[in-house]
UniProtKB/Swiss-Prot annotation:
Keywords: Isoprene biosynthesis, Magnesium, Metal-binding, Thiamine biosynthesis, Thiamine pyrophosphate, Transferase. This is 1-deoxy-D-xylulose-5-phosphate synthase. Its EC number is 2.2.1.7. Catalyzes the acyloin condensation reaction between C atoms 2 and 3 of pyruvate and glyceraldehyde 3-phosphate to yield 1-deoxy-D-xylulose-5-phosphate (DXP). Homodimer. It comes from Pasteurella multocida (strain Pm70). GO terms for biological process: 1-deoxy-D-xylulose 5-phosphate biosynthetic process; isopentenyl diphosphate biosynthetic process, methylerythritol 4-phosphate pathway; terpenoid biosynthetic process; thiamine biosynthetic process. The keyword Transferase applies.
Length: 614
């Protein structure tokens, strides 16, 4: 820590608050450098945290955390917060097995008020926390930090609408890094922020409300005048004022002096407050400033050269999907690709560039994405919703009410299904088979490799009903891609014929299943379809084998193995059944290989489980 003389002294925000304001720019400089060095050595989210260094320092300097409660939305930007709150020396373990969590996590630190991972939850939770504090007369302050992407979600506006109606004391900070700081985010805005948050103005504002409450015409005139003063700098503020917030900003989110001055003033204000700050994602590191998307989440890399390592030569499943989408769009103008703000992650960059009229990024709005797709289907188009398994959970009612009940031809391309890895509990794709399987009209497919994935996407697209194809995070296995053809619905493939034991595989654990079967002389069936399931095959296997083993990367409860159990029960088979899958707890972070080994779903673990069962 010799390169970080001030930062090495900071083991908690209390230490930070002992520094003079004149020392804070140096702390920001050291914090940014330390963040870059640690993430480049461990992997993780980089660009967002680089952009929130000054804000993080200012918040912990002004607010008495953890007594005052600071809530980070999503948590990508919370790495500086972790460094300042006693976890500096553990940053090298972030996102690793048994290491510190990639997002704020309640079990990890008293400074992490809310466990997060999905976006747009901070204001709702913050309002609940603020109401609880107000009822207890605790005297603590509540601050929510939310990004310009997360605030587009309906949940954020629902919470602000409620907060405005309750007039609860809380502060929402919008970290706006969508554009670089323009000239109007300078002296005039900073001066106006000081004016509008100052005690003189706020006392006149609140006192004037009481005096003028019985004089509506004058009250309305004063309100309009105030709005025009604020709107002179930021017309967007009027929208938040209409929700019942006192809007301040935008101000420079990298000016530590102005941030502290504004926050000190706002801490004393009553009612819901909204501070709009402008930051630059990747601030202070030229490669990340130039490519904030590429440096959003990074593997280990050389931060001196700024070069990210090249990926595996085998394409990812996301790229397989993106290539399939382009191939289909070349011949079908009715295809519409939809993503809820995950263009890069879902492999849709090329599609969005080549077919912009057939591409929609609906922002962080999963519910809207699904019902928007339903509307397109009603209008005669063929929508494909590309969505991570963990985010599809957020649109469950829309899948049922707006797609399945009407039996509309919407294809769900479910990325990151199964064990995802380093992002931990909030991002594992553990539940989609279970929550989709119980929905009438839904077809569910589980490809075992990239060619199967393409064929299943094609099959689902050609069906005149809802369909889902789930595929994992990571690289495919390198099989040959064959021309697209429709698959027979609900039909499985015999991969290996053995005796006594039959492994019924659902998904990309097939190579592992084959290796286990070689040792046990077991039959292997690639089931392919969870729904409709191959009842005939299950019946035949049950008659000729002593033990059926189901294998899936989904929770055991309600999963594909449960579907097999239901078939066996309905046909009154007495064949033994061993269901292997994800257990009944939230799966923590680690590499995919580490997690599968811990869950006994690697080759050795599966073999041991079968032998123990016998």
């Amino acid at each position: 820590m010799q390169n970080y003389p001030l930062l090495s002294l900071i083991n908690s925000p209390e230490d930070l608050r002992l520094l003079s304001k004149e020392q804070l720019p140096q702390i920001c400089q050291e914090l940014r450098a330390y963040l870059l060095e640690s993430v480049s050595q461990s992997s993780g989210h980089l660009a967002s945290g680089l952009g929130t260094v000054e804000l993080t320092v200012a918040l912990h300097y002004v607010y008495k955390t953890p007594f005052d409660q600071l809530i980070w939305d999503v948590g990508h930007q919370a790495y500086p917060h972790k460094i300042l709150t006693g976890r500096r020396d553990q940053m090298s373990t972030i996102r690793q097995k048994n290491g510190i969590h990639p997002f704020p996590w309640r079990e990890e630190s008293e400074f992490d008020v809310l466990s997060v991972g999905h976006s747009s939850t901070s204001i709702s939770a913050g309002l609940g926390i603020a109401v609880a504090a107000q009822r207890e007369n605790a005297g603590r302050k509540t601050v929510c930090v939310i990004g310009d992407g997360a605030i587009t979600a309906g949940m954020a506006f629902e919470a602000m609408n409620h907060a405005g109606a309750l007039h609860t004391d809380m502060l929402v900070i919008l970290n706006d890094n969508e554009m670089s700081i323009s000239e109007n985010v300078g002296a005039l805005n900073n001066h106006l922020a000081r004016l509008l948050t100052g005690s003189f103005y706020s006392s006149i504002r609140e006192g004037g409300k009481k005096i003028l409450s019985g004089m509506p015409p004058i009250k309305e005139f004063v309100k309009k005048t105030e709005e025009h003063v604020k709107g002179f700098v930021s017309p967007v503020g009027t929208m938040f004022e209409q929700l019942g917030f006192n809007y301040i900003g935008p101000i420079d989110g990298h000016n530590i002096e102005e941030l502290i001055s504004t926050l000190k003033n706002m801490r004393a204000l009553k009612g819901p407050q909204f501070l709009h700050i402008m930051t630059k994602k990747g601030k202070g590191y030229a490669p990340a400033e130039k490519d904030p998307i590429g440096f959003h989440g990074v593997p280990k890399f050389d931060h001196l050269s700024g070069q990210l390592p090249k990926s595996n030569t085998t394409p990812t499943y996301s790229k397989i999907f993106g290539d399939w989408l382009c191939e289909m769009a070349e011949n079908d103008p009715k295809l519409i690709g939809i993503t809820p703000a995950m263009r890069e992650g879902s492999g849709m960059v090329e599609f969005s560039n080549r077919f912009p009229q057939q591409y929609f990024d609906v922002a962080i709005a999963e519910q809207h994405a699904v019902t928007f797709a339903a509307g397109l289907a009603i209008g005669g188009y063929k929508p494909v919703v590309a969505i991570y398994s963990t985010f599809l959970q957020r649109a469950y009612d829309q899948v049922i009410h707006d797609v399945a009940i009407q039996n509309l031809p919407v294809l769900f391309a479910i990325d990151r299904a199964g064990v995802v890895g380093a992002d931990g509990q909030t991002h594992q794709g553990a539940f989609d088979i279970s929550f989709l399987r119980c929905i009438p009209n839904m077809v569910i497919m589980t490809p075992s490799d990239e060619n199967e994935c393409r064929q299943m996407l094609y099959t689902g697209y050609k069906l005149n009903q809802p369909a889902a194809v789930r595929y994992p995070r990571g690289n495919a296995i390198g099989v040959e891609l064959t021309p697209l053809t429709m698959l027979a619905l609900g039909k499985s493939n015999l991969i290996r014929e053995g005796e006594k034991i039959a492994i019924l595989n659902f998904g990309t654990l097939l190579p592992t299943a084959i290796n286990v079967a070689e040792k046990l002389n077991a039959t292997v069936i690639d089931m392919r379809f969870v729904k409709p399931i191959d009842v005939e095959r299950i019946h035949q296997i049950a008659q000729t084998h002593d033990l059926i083993v189901t294998l899936e990367e989904n929770v055991i409860q309600g999963g594909a193995g449960s579907a097999v159990a239901e078939v066996l029960h309905s046909q009154q088979h007495q064949t033994k059944l061993l269901q292997l899958g994800l257990p009944d707890f939230f799966i923590p972070q680690g590499t995919q290989q580490e997690i599968l080994a811990d869950l006994h779903l690697d080759e050795a673990g599966i073999e041991t489980q079968i032998k123990n069962f016998l």
